């Protein structure tokens, strides 16, 4: 190879655009001389890169690669919406019978059942309460034969206790000059004076024998009493007629036997044996005859009084001109 030829070729190579592929202006290609032997030498000129040629045709797809190793488990995704309810499955076989449980508590009673139980097992009188160990005088609930509850004053101190008080006068705070309906239903104040009611008196005395005790106290504090073997009051259709037993004893004497078998009289219903209304005449309400030997529902007067027989009088005690400070009528089953 001749040198002039090489340099001429070299000049042609230097004619390549200086801007090709981002070459800076004035940049020269590198020239390297490679010795091949003693006589020949080859000059290698690294010229600027040419413009890229058009893309070649798409090659054939390669053979599939082998399955790679399993990657790490990803985090769980969000819960999807609930699906529709499926059809119930078939009933499974019965399970093994369990062990017997403990005995349960007794069932609670309803209002009616509780009321019936209290009626059947509850006290029927103050005497009944006494036999159950109640020894204090006071107000208690007993049950009538028709199972209705009734609050009564029980005297647990006098004459062995067990007395049901149905009439009480102590201070004049209650007016006892009342009509038929008032005496039928009862009236007064639990803490002071009262009449229990003729309907209740009938129910309390209709079955079994009831003895009667009358306790009196004058304004000097002296007490006296009268006691009868039995006491019974009929129903309203018979005008609450009094049926009285034998006078047994008492320092006050017997001022009630005269009124035996008499009907009850008030100022608006006259059932006595007098041509006039004894209740209106003597300002009370009682089993008047013609008219009375006792009038414990009369006016509350302060001891001796000039008026005749219109106070809380007990004839065989201090007469018809003396009104007692305290009067109590009470019954007890015998």
Curated annotation (Swiss-Prot):
Q: Which Pfam families match?
A: Collagen, Fibrinogen_C
Glycosylation sites (chain numbering):
261
Disulphide-bonded residues: 119-147, 126-154, 278-291
Which residues hold Ca(2+)? 270, 272
Localization per record: Secreted; Cell membrane
The Collagen-like domain is annotated at: 50-88
- Annotated a carbohydrate binding lies at 290-292
The entry's keywords: Calcium, Cell membrane, Collagen, Disulfide bond, Glycoprotein, Immunity, Innate immunity, Lectin, Membrane, Metal-binding, Repeat, Secreted, Signal
Regarding protein family, the annotation reads: Belongs to the ficolin lectin family.
Biological role: Extracellular lectin functioning as a pattern-recognition receptor in innate immunity. Binds the sugar moieties of pathogen-associated molecular patterns (PAMPs) displayed on microbes and activates the lectin pathway of the complement system. May also activate monocytes through a G protein-coupled receptor, FFAR2, inducing the secretion of interleukin-8/IL-8. Binds preferentially to 9-O-acetylated 2-6-linked sialic acid derivatives and to various glycans containing sialic acid engaged in a 2-3 linkage.
Q: What is this protein called?
A: Ficolin-1
Q: Can you name the source organism?
A: Mus musculus (Mouse)
In the UniProt record, the gene name given for this protein reads Fcn1
């Amino acid at each position: 190879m001749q040198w002039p030829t090489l340099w001429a070729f070299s000049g042609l190579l230097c004619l390549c655009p200086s801007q090709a592929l981002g070459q800076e202006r004035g940049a020269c290609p590198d020239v390297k001389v490679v010795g091949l032997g003693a006589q020949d030498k080859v000059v290698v000129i690294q010229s600027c890169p040419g413009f890229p040629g058009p893309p070649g045709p798409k090659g054939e797809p390669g053979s599939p690669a082998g399955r790679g190793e399993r990657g790490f488990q990803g985090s769980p995704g969000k819960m999807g919406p609930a699906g529709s309810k499926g059809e119930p499955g078939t009933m499974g076989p019965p399970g093994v019978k369990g062990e017997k449980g403990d005995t349960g508590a007794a069932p609670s009673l309803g209002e009616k059942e509780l009321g019936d139980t209290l009626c059947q097992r509850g006290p029927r009188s103050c005497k009944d309460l006494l036999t159950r160990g109640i020894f204090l005088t006071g107000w208690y609930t007993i049950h009538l034969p028709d199972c209705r509850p009734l609050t009564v004053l029980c005297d647990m101190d006098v004459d062995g206790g067990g007395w049901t008080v149905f009439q009480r006068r102590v201070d004049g705070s209650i007016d006892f000059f009342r009509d038929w309906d008032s005496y039928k239903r009862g009236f007064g104040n639990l803490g002071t004076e009262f009449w229990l009611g003729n309907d209740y008196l009938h129910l309390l005395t209709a079955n079994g024998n009831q003895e009667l005790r009358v306790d009196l106290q004058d304004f000097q504090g002296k007490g006296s009493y009268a006691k009868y073997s039995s006491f019974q009051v009929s129903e309203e259709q018979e005008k609450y007629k009094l049926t009285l037993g034998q006078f047994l004893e008492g320092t006050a004497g017997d001022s009630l036997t005269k009124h035996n078998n008499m009907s009850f009289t008030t100022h608006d219903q006259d059932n006595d044996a007098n041509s006039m209304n004894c209740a209106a005449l003597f300002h009370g309400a009682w089993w008047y005859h013609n008219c009375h030997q006792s009038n414990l529902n009369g006016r509350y007067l302060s001891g001796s009084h000039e008026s005749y027989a219109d106070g809380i009088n007990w004839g065989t005690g201090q007469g018809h001109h003396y009104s007692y400070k305290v009067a109590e009528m009470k019954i007890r089953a015998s």
